[in-house]
C-alpha cells in the first residue's frame, strides 16, 4: 500500500490555520479521501500541559524562558504522537496537521539573535527529524499574513481550552510575531512549501476563507494528490 501524504498548515498566530484545516477536512470528506487530522500542540498530552503553563506565563515572561527549553516541550509533544502519525501514514491515509515542526522552528528561533538562528534551526531540525525520527512533510501550506494583522485577528478568537487570557504569552507580543513571521518567510523558501497570501495589501483586507481554501486545495491537488494516484 502506498504511504500516505503528510500535509501541514502553517503560519503565525491569527493566520487562519484552524479554519483552513477544517475546510480541508470537509473537502477530503466530500471527495472520499481517507485522512487523519492532528493539531499541535496537543494540550491534553503530558508535554502539552507544560506548554500550556509556558504560554500562560507560569514559567515567567517570554524572554525569561530559554528557547531551547521551550523547543523541547513542543518537540516532545510531537514525539508522543509519532506512533499515531506513522500508523496513519503507513495505512495509506493522508495526514493533515494544524501546525507541525515549522511552528517550533519559527516561534523559538524568533527569540534567538538573528546571527544565531541558522545554528538554532539546524539543532532543532536534528532533534525533531533526526533524534526523534518524526516524519518529514510532503507539503507545507504557509498562510502568510502581516504580523500586525495576525495580532489583530487573535484578539477576535473565542476562548481556548489552555488559557483564560485573550492572548497567550506569544500572541500578546507583537514584536515576537514579527520575528516569527520573518523566520517563516525564510523557511518558506524550502521546495516542499507553498505560500498562500492571505492578506490583500492593496485593499487592506483579509481574503475570504473560501478564496484561501481554493488556493490551498489547488496546491494540494497539484503538488501532492496528483502524485498519489488521485
What do the predicted segments below correspond to?
Residues 25, 148-230:
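NTP-dependent small-molecule kinase module
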Residues 20:
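Hydrophobic positions on the alpha1 helix immediately C-terminal to the Walker A/P-loop
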Residues 30-132:
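ATP-dependent small-molecule kinase phosphotransfer cores
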Residues 17:
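Conserved lysine of the Walker
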Residues 1-6:
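Extreme N-terminal, non-catalytic leader segments
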Residues 103-182:
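A glycine- and Lys/Arg-enriched "phosphate-lid" helix/loop adjacent to the NTP-binding pocket
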Residues 12:
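P-loop (Walker A) phosphate-binding loop of NTP-binding proteins
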Residues 9:
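Hydrophobic anchor at the beta1->P-loop junction of P-loop NTPases
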